[in-house]
């Protein structure tokens, strides 16, 4: 029957790229995004400071939109709290692109702690009916794996270890898959792993490493649960990524991805993920 067939389709996360102003949350979700990616910059003391990308950024985008990090978290909480006037039921996942390149390696743990404190207070509302979206902490440098432990330790110290159920991980530096696996071993992490691969939309990048990540995901002993590709703005690239078997597509144009998912070749194999889809679960065909 139809419902059973629907269940066999791969759930897809359409990830709105560089959503750094509160007003852009609605803009991207209304275009079809069920998830967003937000840049987080840090000050010299490893405090998350702004949701800001800066120059250069993707072709065709303004690089300079920003909010204070905690203000953005409050706006995000409104958008992901059922019953709130600003609630967007479709928005189920947020990737924080952590710009830790400005920090010394020995500040990574501290950055994780401060990030957790901010999220706990301003997004999770101290564990009292806060935002419901799943969160992916995306780290650009494998050496900054202690950020994960700092984040986890802080939530535990503040009495909310259960919130780690809503948190996943990504290393975004396009490193060799084996090296990424080793970083997770050092961090003591198994599960809740998203693997990104990609490059700015100004440049072309093949799917070789995406396919390696997907092979790891689909192998019996792989450490990856989900694979996403960025930044995908064209229909042809979207089709190639879906054909390869990705779980997520990061884009400046969510409506383009939505259009492709509605094409006859794709609508019986893929569907837009909903809140009921566990983003930490490897999809089995």
UniProtKB/Swiss-Prot annotation:
Binding site for Mg(2+): 37, 39, 97
Active-site residues per Swiss-Prot or TrEMBL entry: 17, 53
Residue ranges listed under propeptide: 1-5
Subcellular location: Secreted
Pfam family, one: GDPD_2
InterPro entries named among the record's database cross-references: PLC-like_Pdiesterase_TIM-brl
Cofactor binding: number and manner: Binds 1 Mg(2+) ion per subunit.
Lipid metabolism is among the record's keywords: yes
KW Metal-binding (keyword) present: yes
Tissue: Expressed by the venom gland.
Disulfide bridge positions per record: 57-63, 59-202
Keywords: Cytolysis, Dermonecrotic toxin, Disulfide bond, Glycoprotein, Hemolysis, Lipid degradation, Lipid metabolism, Lyase, Magnesium, Metal-binding, Secreted, Toxin, Zymogen
Catalysed reaction, written as an equation: an N-(acyl)-sphingosylphosphocholine = an N-(acyl)-sphingosyl-1,3-cyclic phosphate + choline; an N-(acyl)-sphingosylphosphoethanolamine = an N-(acyl)-sphingosyl-1,3-cyclic phosphate + ethanolamine; a 1-acyl-sn-glycero-3-phosphocholine = a 1-acyl-sn-glycero-2,3-cyclic phosphate + choline; a 1-acyl-sn-glycero-3-phosphoethanolamine = a 1-acyl-sn-glycero-2,3-cyclic phosphate + ethanolamine
Glycosylation sites: 262
Superkingdom of this protein's organism: Eukaryota
GO MF, one example: toxin activity
A GO term from the CC aspect: extracellular region
Gene3D superfamilies noted in UniProt: Phosphatidylinositol (PI) phosphodiesterase
GO biological process: killing of cells of another organism; lipid catabolic process
Major localisation: secreted
EC numbers for this chain: 4.6.1.-
Cofactor: Mg(2+)
Family note: Belongs to the arthropod phospholipase D family. Class II subfamily. Class IIa sub-subfamily.
Record's function text: Dermonecrotic toxins cleave the phosphodiester linkage between the phosphate and headgroup of certain phospholipids (sphingolipid and lysolipid substrates), forming an alcohol (often choline) and a cyclic phosphate. This toxin acts on sphingomyelin (SM) with high activity. It may also act on ceramide phosphoethanolamine (CPE), lysophosphatidylcholine (LPC) and lysophosphatidylethanolamine (LPE), but not on lysophosphatidylserine (LPS), and lysophosphatidylglycerol (LPG). It acts by transphosphatidylation, releasing exclusively cyclic phosphate products as second products.
Protein name: Dermonecrotic toxin LiSicTox-alphaIA2aii
